[in-house]
């Protein structure tokens, strides 16, 4: 199964947010629904991470650009949503001890059907092209960037210890 549009992703995420999840911890059963815990779903414009869970704002967000770029990868998008839901549930069950990618979080993640891995494997998803590159004319080094740099950089391969104008990197717009 693949998503046909970003609206399908949103609908699926909201459906998973209203589902009841059963988590067993130390012989105690927790039945939790993310939306009933106050969590909302939204998209953001991140280009380097697929998902995010904010305990303070009670938001679970997905990268709209990465989702649009990977509509044909149901498994990855679904697992990312479950990954972020696992953060919300683990925080509810364990408090700050359950945040991050601790063993407690992995247990919760696997309990709800997530693979329990910290990050997605870049070979499994389509990554967004970098709009800019910093190029060294001396060694040919190439440093991809999503945003145009606001200051000058020098090549770390040619002069790793300090900034050196002799090895100034040239900004190239890729598209």
Where are these regions (language model features)?
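Walker B catalytic acidic pair
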Residues: 84
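Active-site-proximal or metal-binding-adjacent scaffold patches in catalytic folds
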Residues: 1-79, 88-175
């Amino acid at each position: 199964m693949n998503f046909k549009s970003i609206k399908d992703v949103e609908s699926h995420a909201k459906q998973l947010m209203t589902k009841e999840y059963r988590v067993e911890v130390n012989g105690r059963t927790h039945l939790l629904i993310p939306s009933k815990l106050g969590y909302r779903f939204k998209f953001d414009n991140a280009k380097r991470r697929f998902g995010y869970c904010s305990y303070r704002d009670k938001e679970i967000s997905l990268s709209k650009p990465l989702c649009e770029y990977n509509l044909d990868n149901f498994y990855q998008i679904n697992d990312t949503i479950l990954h972020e839901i696992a953060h919300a549930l683990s925080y509810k069950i364990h408090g700050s001890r359950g945040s991050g990618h601790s063993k407690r979080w992995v247990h919760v993640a696997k309990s709800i059907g997530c693979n329990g891995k910290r990050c997605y494997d870049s070979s499994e998803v389509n990554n967004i092209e970098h709009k800019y590159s910093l190029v060294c004319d001396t060694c040919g080094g190439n440093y991809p960037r999503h945003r145009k740099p606001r200051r000058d950089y020098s090549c770390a391969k040619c002069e790793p210890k300090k900034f050196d104008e002799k090895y100034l990197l040239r900004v190239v717009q890729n598209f």
